[in-house]
Amino acid sequence: MSFEINRNILIAVDESENAQRAVTYVGKLLGGIKGFKVAVLHVISEPEEDYFQSESDKDKWYKEYRQQVDQMLEKYRNILIDTGFDPGDVLVRSTIRYCPSMAECILAEVDQTEYSTLVVGRKGLTHKEEFLFGSVSGKIVRTARNCTVWVVE
């Protein structure tokens, strides 16, 4: 019996060094191996409606933040290409969502796409902080279904 392995990988990122390490890890591990497709995703957590004084303030914030995110995603894309991924096999994208939990938003993206592996960086929390506040990667590991999760230290 043979079956086709889904080689689509989603890397959920933010601006942290841990996220960059996750991207670099995937690049060094799989770059140059044919058949893998990688998407780098940044979820922009939409602020509460009353966070901004006006709609124009919200638009200005979104435009400026989107520019930062686009630069970050391009940097991560280049890391993957420089480590051997074909440019056509690397997708970067951001999405804005209302996120009561960032982990839930990331897992919703996995559920809506064809990615079988989710890669996240481990947040640099102490054990005490992680116990008190939890972590995105910890919640993803506990609640992910129908995908493999890699947590990069």
Locate each region found by the language model.
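A short acidic, glycine-rich active-site loop
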Residues: 58-71
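A generic secondary-structure signal
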Residues: 25-29, 79, 108-109
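Structural beta-alpha unit
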Residues: 1-4, 81-117, 138
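General small-molecule cofactor/ligand-binding pocket signal
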Residues: 39-41, 91-95, 150
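Small/aliphatic-rich secondary-structure junction motif
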Residues: 2-59
